[in-house]
Structures are given as C-alpha cells and as structure tokens.
Amino acid sequence: MTEPLRIVFAGTPEFAAEHLKALLTSPHDVVAVYTQPDRPAGRGQKLMPSPVKQLALEHNIPVLQPPTLRNAEAQAELAALNPDLLVVVAYGLILPQAVLDIPRLGCINSHASLLPRWRGAAPIQRAVEAGDSESGVTVMRMEAGLDTGPMLLKVTTPITAADTGGSLHDRLAELGPPAVIQAIAGLAAGTLEGEVQDDSLATYAHKLNKDEARIDWSRPAVELERLVRAFNPWPICHSTLNGEALKVLAATLAEGAGAPGEIIGASKDGLLVACGEQALCLTRLQLPGGKALNFSDLFNSRREKFALGTVLGVVAQ
C-alpha cells in the first residue's frame, strides 16, 4: 500500500460533502478544506455555512473561504499546505493554472455527468431535461478549461422515467465518492492513465435559471414532463391559475387536446392540461400559502378552482 496522501478538498454543496465524508474515512490526510464564503439563506437571510464547511468543522479540519484563488496571496496560502493532491467537487470557483500546478499529483474533479456530455454547472438537471437514458460521474484530471480534462474513471447509472433532479442527484452523490477514492489510489500508485475527451461530443449544462421554470404550455407535453422532473426540487416548475402562482411538482404524460394551458379534465387522478402537443396530467401541486399536495387532496377541497376551460399561465407567442 502507498503512503497516505496530503489532500486538500475544495467543494461547497451537499453533493461535495458526500465526497468529503468518504475522504475522511480513507487512509489519506485531509489537511484543509476550501469552500465558498457563507451565504444568506432562509427567510431571515442569515449567513449560513456550506454543507462542506459544516462537515469540516465537525472534524476539526481547517476551513478556508477565499472569494477568489486568482491572487498571489491565496495561492501562497494553498502552497503552504504542501498538498499532494487537490480534490475538487462542485466548488464553484474557477481554478487558474497557477493553482492547478501547486499539488504534487495535480488536481482531480468529480463531475456529475458522463463527460464530455454536460460540461458545466447543472449537468444533473440538464440530463433529465434532455431525456437522456443514462447519467453518471466522471472523475477527471483538471486543466484550465471548463470540465475538459482527461477522464480517469466513469461510473454510470440509468435515468428512469420516474427520476427527478433530486433523485438523480442523490444517486450520483452515492456513486461519486467511491470512484474518487479509487482514482486517488490509482494516481498514488502511478497506474491510472487519463482518457482525452472528444470535444466534438461536448455539450454544456448551463446554470439553472428561475425564468426557465415558468411553464410554456405551447411546448410539447413530453418536454414539459421532463422539465417538471428535472427542476424538482429546484427551481420547481410553475404557472398561474386565475392570476395566482401555481407550482407543479409532479406530472405525467397524457392524451388530450385543447388550447395550450387549457384545463380539459379534472379528477382525483390529476389535473389534465392541454399542451402544444398532447397533454400533461398534473398530479402534485402547491398553491400560494399552502404546502405541496397531491391533486386528489386539492380536488376534494378546492374543486371550484379547477373549472374546465380555465387557461393556465401565459402562453408564449
């Protein structure tokens, strides 16, 4: 067995924290953790530490939160840690070449897609939105480009017809950490070779935008059904009903015709809404001031709100 490595970890959200947990139970030494500065969150907008910071503090690991790693001071601080390897998972900052050159064995990244497909910020949601049949985690050696480095390991998982952005996230958060541990072992032993990405196959997973979550009922129902799943639990697809906000948390593909956004059926099975092609059966909704409910519960208590012929939302022209 090779000697334990001095590892610096850089990550921010829960997906990254799962990877840090695995490193903390490995033979290697996590000597410091980098994470994004604390951000305001919740109704009170109190400053909240990231999941990675919370985990690091629980294990008495030094936490660094520089707003950038592009200046000489931040780079000198990293170099002083004398890391063998920098492990990066959903950190949120671009690492300049000067940083990538500091660790003895370089820098690796766990990315939640099967690269080169879905480089970028939101690979999990974009894979569901696009109707991909599979996803996975790629562990790659980092270089200055965005998710362009040589691929060291891949693990795959099917995307099911029931998967949401949340369920796929959770599955990939389980698959990624063991792959990172395996990749570290290969790098330490000098037995792992990287596979160059084919840039001609690259697609980009642009950052999620809340405006994208507004449902355009003129789109085909098959696209909207995937969007509803992809954007759950955030940013949640939404429309309006009689001028009030309506969040759509779950829906199924259905047959039916009418003006886009028109309610063409309502029963305990769901709210049937016409789309540009086919229809969506909305099965879980949230009204203003209320909690998310299955439509069967809303149908029993608020049936009058869902009159046939009512048109949801603003249809794009």
From Swiss-Prot:
Q: Which positions does UniProt annotate for (6S)-5,6,7,8-tetrahydrofolate binding? A: S113, L114, L115, P116
Q: Name the chemical reaction catalysed here.
A: L-methionyl-tRNA(fMet) + (6R)-10-formyltetrahydrofolate = N-formyl-L-methionyl-tRNA(fMet) + (6S)-5,6,7,8-tetrahydrofolate + H(+)
Task: List, alphabetically, the InterPro entries matched.
Answer: Fmt (IPR005794), Formyl_trans_C (IPR005793), Formyl_trans_C_sf (IPR037022), Formyl_transf_N (IPR002376), Formyl_transf_N_sf (IPR036477), Formyl_transferase-like_C_sf (IPR011034), GART_AS (IPR001555), Met-tRNA-FMT_C (IPR044135)
As recorded in UniProt, its EC number(s) are 2.1.2.9
Q: Name one Pfam family in it.
A: Formyl_trans_C
**Any one GO cellular component localisation term in the record:** cytosol
The UniProt entry, under PROSITE patterns, shows: GART
The protein's superkingdom reads Bacteria
Molecular function as annotated in GO: methionyl-tRNA formyltransferase activity
Enzyme class per UniProt:
transferase
What UniProt keywords are attached to this protein's entry? Protein biosynthesis, Transferase
State the family it belongs to: Belongs to the Fmt family.
Q: What does this protein do?
A: Attaches a formyl group to the free amino group of methionyl-tRNA(fMet). The formyl group appears to play a dual role in the initiator identity of N-formylmethionyl-tRNA by promoting its recognition by IF2 and preventing the misappropriation of this tRNA by the elongation apparatus.
Query: Which named protein is this?
Result: Methionyl-tRNA formyltransferase
